[in-house]
Amino acid sequence: MKLKCLLVDDEPPALKVLAHHLSNINGTEIMGQCKNALEALDVLNSKPVDLIFLDIHLPKLKGMAFLKTLSDPPAVIITTAYHQYAIEGFDLN
């Protein structure tokens, strides 16, 4: 069984790096690459996802605000350079 991953980041280079590394890990499958939280919500509503790689600073709806809207979120890995957001993300999931 593969770990189904969703990548959410508004920076194309960050998405590319994450996708590249995940493609080299056996047992993972990328279910989508999204530039904002609204695109991610569409994927979550249409495909099974086990793990989200979520950037904090997103257009339209910030990563933490998006995470708070999910009633039963999959596991989440926060991708940020700001430790205070990482701690808040850990507390939410």
Tell what function each PLM region has:
Residues P12-G32:
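Two-component/phosphorelay signaling modules centered on CheY-like receiver
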